[in-house]
Amino acid sequence: MSLTEAQQSRIATVACPFCATLNRVDLARLADRPRCGECRRPILLDRPIAVSDANLERVLAGTDVPVMMDGYADWCGPCKIMAPVLDDFARERAGEVLVIKLDTDRNPVTTQRLAIRAIPTLIVFRNARETARHAGVTSRQQLDALVALEPRVT
């Protein structure tokens, strides 16, 4: 007998926002308020989590649920418009989608590797592979549509 999707483990690998230690978190147990294994501070997955050149690949490889990455810059007006929309999306979809953010100015290696040429750029990953991309400001409904897209056959 196969497990239903609801019974399957949903794991995310996230960097602690306080000490940068990578932690594997069972998304089915978010109500238990996961804590960092190193510094013991809370890992809050109801908001976008910052990633960097140093840890993005490990976060993507260690996460079983879709990952939506926001490529942004602090000085970008449209990025500031998108920030509260992404905050709401992360809160509403916590446990189903991991929302991460990459500062494109501070992480040029990943910015170049992912060919981010406009900001904000939203990229959806499944199993560490890009499945959808959108450049520019978008609506909350479009975020759901981006995550719902089936992976491209390559």
Kindly give the residue locations of the regions a language model identified:
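Short pre-active-site segment immediately N-terminal to redox-active cysteine/selenocysteine motifs
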Residues: F18, D64, G71-W75, A118
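A short beta-strand-turn-helix
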Residues: L22, P48-V67
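Conserved redox-active cysteine motifs that mediate thiol-disulfide chemistry
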Residues: G71-V85
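Short cysteine-rich clusters marking metal-coordination/redox-active sites
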Residues: C16-C19, C36-C39
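Structural micro-motif
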Residues: V65-V67, L114-I123
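Thiol-based oxidoreductase modules, predominantly thioredoxin-like and allied folds used
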Residues: V51, G71, L86-V109, I116-I119
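Non-catalytic, surface beta->alpha helical segment in thiol-disulfide oxidoreductase systems
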Residues: A118, I123-T154
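Short linker/helix segments within small regulatory modules
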Residues: V25-P34
